[in-house]
């Protein structure tokens, strides 16, 4: 075979192929004669193709992924390299049988097999002769069939009509190549150099954009002249489609050019009209001037507006600056300069509104009522800047709306979480296209008054980036001495924010910039107690969810005991968001029963709760007996409330080592060390031999080792545990304690007293030891929460031991020598 230049048609490279080069041949008349003289085998393995048809003489690559196809190719490649190729009737069939394939196919030679990384096989095939399946011999491991050759009816060599048809085929093929943007012009060279009549028809048929059914129809035509005519018909249709497509594209391009020209002329005409008359813009600017006269501006603001309006009159209406200037003046007019909503000074009404929407939160409510009282006495008082800090879900954001309702003010809120661009606070300068005011000014425009209740939500989530530090921009907003002339970059004028009541919310005060934190009055909101959560659920959450699910109190009720079971057994949070979700689950179960007319309990029972929510997994600890030496009940406080904490200690023979376990932090470890050193220093007073500390090892442990624990409040509990262990004395029944210890024997106050007291009461504790200085914390707790509890206030460690330890030894007391 002679070598040919590399050509690419429809992603198919056309070259000569031999064993030493990766080439795919164009068929010559000599090749065709040699191929026609080859005898076909009696039977062949049959390879079904999904979406293509192989013509004699044509070379195509095939990707095989089916197991049968891969095995067939591998076996044939290892043998005679001759296979039968047929097209599937339905390309979706994964395992076609003899009834799912066309009977007419092409004998093919395997030129090359390439194994792909994904396990598939790519095989390059060259068509040889057409054949017809006589009978399928087997279908496993792949299809094998007996075949017979299908002869090709060739026209007479002197048939001038056939010659003209072939010339037309070549000419149309060249025209299609020129019209199609996807076929390279080099393909013309290949068409012109094809000498074989049948290969020309087969090559063109193979590369036309036809369906498998249409190509199979061409392959099935025995007469070469008839096949050439049918191919010519398809080519005419293809050429007409291409010409029509190109005409449409040319027309679209012309239409776009025409539209652009008309737009340009229209803009020119509009500019000329504006220069001659300028009617619409002038009217708009006159309206702005009239509206400005109704505003309560000071002289400086009035002059600034007139100056900016005059600047707008001189601008070209088509320039981008004109649109920015219009937006600026519209904002200037829409801002509520000097417009304030009238405050309601009915303090009883305000208290009622606050109590209606929020249970507890006494400190916040007290501060709001105090502000109202002072505002009532002195009308020009600057609004406070308050920061409510506490865990999620305790009502920090929602209380702002209640405050606005109580004061009779508008309510606006912006979320600062993730804000990293200073321009979001101060706005963009007017020199930028698309410039806008900051969120503060935009929110005031939306509120329509200059004294709304303004919630700055998640102020601790502010972050800085390449566009500046928004937390620094807030320094001016939240400074009562500066915010009477807040400067927005877009507004370019000082705006009075002194009457705005800013309420910021945060979860972590440590994340707030110190200078910003210093400008705010911080009110800490601790998590709700169990009792408060139950009351909130009863007053607010349960009725709210009943209404949300289309039920009323006649359809379903719930008792405090069941609400407490949900709170303690299924939630562990500071707020009430998860509690509301659990209540909604219980109500949905009842709503389903109502809708399906099923029987159900109209009063929620414990069994209903377990049925809907499952078995409780968050049961709290209860007080245990005092029969074991070294076991003392302490009190702990976390962000989700209080809990009791057991301190355990054990003694064993050794050399005086102290082991501390239970996932404790450094502060708790130090408390244990202080307690032991205090006992050593006061061994004689406690009736202990100093030799004990050289002969025995002590192990101190706090259960629930998976939970990290830290803080000084377990100090007196650790001390009591170690003394009980060393003396083998019983600890007083139903007693818990909390307090920090020092080497001098002093007991210091600790925090979270309210939560700890409530946790102790729930756990069945009757007596509690506290530092004397914590008495003020007890005085702030409602009396109903303290019923049944006895408090012992101490200053010294000796007082703790005198109260906590009894004269009785524990059962099976050890004798320590």
From Swiss-Prot:
It is found in: Cytoplasm. SUPFAM superfamilies: P-loop containing nucleoside triphosphate hydrolases (SSF52540), PUA domain-like (SSF88697), Ribosomal protein S5 domain 2-like (SSF54211). Keywords: ATP-binding, Cytoplasm, Hydrolase, Nucleotide-binding, Protease, Serine protease, Stress response. ATP-dependent serine protease that mediates the selective degradation of mutant and abnormal proteins as well as certain short-lived regulatory proteins. Required for cellular homeostasis and for survival from DNA damage and developmental changes induced by stress. Degrades polypeptides processively to yield small peptide fragments that are 5 to 10 amino acids long. Binds to DNA in a double-stranded, site-specific manner. ATP binds at residues 390-397. Homohexamer. Organized in a ring with a central cavity. Belongs to the peptidase S16 family. SMART domains: AAA, LON. Residues 626-807 form the Lon proteolytic domain. This is Lon protease. GO terms for cellular component: cytoplasm. Induction: By heat shock. Residues 44-239 form the Lon N-terminal domain. Its main location: cytoplasm. The keyword Protease applies. Its EC number is 3.4.21.53. The active site is at residues 713, 756. It catalyses: Hydrolysis of proteins in presence of ATP. CDD domains: RecA-like_Lon (cd19500). One of its GO terms (biological process) is cellular response to heat. It comes from Flavobacterium johnsoniae (strain ATCC 17061 / DSM 2064 / JCM 8514 / BCRC 14874 / CCUG 350202 / NBRC 14942 / NCIMB 11054 / UW101) (Cytophaga johnsonae). The keyword Repressor does not apply.
């Amino acid at each position: 075979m002679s070598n040919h230049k590399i050509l690419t048609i429809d992603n198919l490279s056309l070259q000569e192929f031999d064993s030493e080069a990766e080439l795919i041949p164009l068929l010559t008349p000599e090749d065709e004669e040699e191929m026609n003289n080859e005898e076909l085998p009696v039977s062949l393995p049959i390879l079904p193709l999904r979406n293509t048809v192989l013509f004699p003489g044509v070379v195509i690559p095939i990707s095989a992924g089916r197991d049968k196809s891969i095995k067939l190719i591998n076996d044939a490649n290892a043998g005679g390299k001759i296979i039968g190729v047929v097209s599937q009737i339905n390309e979706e069939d994964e395992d076609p049988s003899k009834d799912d394939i066309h009977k007419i196919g092409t004998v093919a030679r395997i030129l090359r097999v390439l194994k792909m990384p994904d396990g598939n096989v790519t095989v390059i095939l060259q068509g040889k002769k057409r054949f017809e399946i006589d009978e399928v011999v087997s279908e496993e491991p792949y299809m094998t069939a007996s075949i017979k050759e299908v002869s090709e009816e060739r026209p007479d060599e002197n048939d001038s009509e056939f010659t003209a048809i072939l010339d037309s085929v070549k000419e149309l093929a060249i025209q299609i190549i020129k019209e199609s943007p996807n076929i390279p012009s080099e393909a013309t060279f290949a068409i012109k150099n094809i000498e074989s009549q049948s290969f020309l028809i087969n090559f063109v048929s193979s590369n036309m954009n036809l369906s498998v059914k249409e190509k199979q129809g061409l392959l099935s035509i025995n007469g070469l002249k008839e096949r050439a005519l049918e191919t010519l018909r398809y080519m005419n249709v293809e050429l007409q489609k291409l010409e029509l497509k190109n005409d449409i594209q040319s027309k679209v391009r012309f239409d776009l050019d025409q539209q652009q020209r008309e737009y340009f002329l229209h803009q020119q005409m509009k500019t000329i009209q504006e220069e001659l008359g300028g009617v619409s813009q002038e009217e708009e600017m006159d309206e702005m001037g009239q509206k400005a006269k109704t505003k309560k501006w000071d002289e400086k603001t009035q002059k600034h507006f007139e100056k900016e309006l005059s600047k707008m009159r001189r601008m070209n209406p088509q320039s981008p600056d004109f649109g920015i200037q219009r937006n600026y003046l519209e904002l200037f007019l829409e801002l509520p300069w000097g417009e304030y909503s009238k405050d309601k000074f009915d303090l009883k009404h305000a208290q009622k509104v606050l109590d209606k929407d929020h249970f507890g939160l006494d400190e916040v409510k007290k501060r709001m009522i105090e502000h109202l009282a002072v505002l009532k006495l002195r009308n020009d008082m600057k609004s406070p800047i308050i920061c409510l800090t506490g865990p999620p879900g305790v009502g920090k954001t929602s209380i702002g709306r209640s405050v606005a309702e109580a004061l009779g003010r508008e309510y606006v809120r912006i979320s600062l979480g993730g804000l990293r661009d200073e321009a979001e606070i101060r706005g963009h300068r007017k020199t930028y296209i698309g410039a806008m005011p900051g969120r503060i000014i935009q929110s005031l425009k939306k509120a329509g008054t200059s004294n709304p209740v303004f919630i700055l939500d998640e102020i601790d989530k502010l972050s800085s980036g390449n566009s500046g530090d928004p937390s620094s921009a807030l320094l001016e907003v939240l400074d009562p001495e500066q915010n009477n002339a807040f400067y927005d970059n877009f507004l370019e004028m000082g705006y009075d924010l002194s009457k705005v009541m800013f309420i910021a919310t945060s979860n972590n005060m440590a994340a707030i910039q110190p200078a910003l934190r210093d400008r705010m009055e911080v009110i800490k909101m601790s998590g709700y107690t169990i009792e408060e959560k139950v009351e909130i659920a009863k007053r607010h959450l349960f009725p709210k969810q009943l209404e949300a699910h289309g039920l009323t109190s006649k359809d379903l009720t719930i008792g405090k005991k069941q609400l407490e079971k949900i709170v303690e057994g299924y939630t562990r949070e500071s707020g009430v968001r998860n509690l509301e979700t659990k209540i909604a689950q219980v109500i949905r179960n009842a709503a389903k029963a109502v809708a399906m007319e099923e029987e159900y309990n109209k009063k929620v029972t414990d069994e209903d709760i377990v049925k809907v929510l499952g078995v409780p997994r968050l049961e709290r600890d209860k007080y245990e007996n005092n029969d074991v030496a070294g076991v003392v009940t302490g009190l702990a406080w976390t962000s989700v409330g209080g809990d009791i904490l057991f301190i355990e200690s054990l003694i064993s023979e050794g050399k005086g080592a102290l082991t501390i376990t239970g996932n404790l932090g450094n502060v708790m470890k130090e408390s244990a060390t202080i307690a032991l050193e205090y006992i050593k220093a006061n061994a004689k007073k406690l009736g202990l031999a100093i030799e004990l500390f050289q002969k025995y090892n002590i192990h101190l442990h706090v259960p629930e080792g998976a939970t990290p624990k830290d803080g000084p409040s377990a100090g007196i509990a650790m001390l009591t545990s170690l003394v009980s262990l060393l003396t083998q004395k019983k600890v007083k029944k139903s007693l818990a304690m909390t307090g920090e210890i020092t080497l001098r024997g002093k007991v210091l106050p600790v925090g979270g007293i309210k939560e700890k007291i409530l946790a102790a009461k729930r756990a069945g504790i009757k007596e509690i030891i506290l530092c004397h200085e914590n008495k003020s914390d007890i005085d702030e707790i409602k009396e109903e929460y303290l019923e049944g509890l006895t408090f012992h206030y101490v200053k010294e460690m000796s007082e703790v031991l005198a109260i906590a330890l009894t004269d009785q030894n524990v059962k099976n007391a050890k004798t320590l020598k």
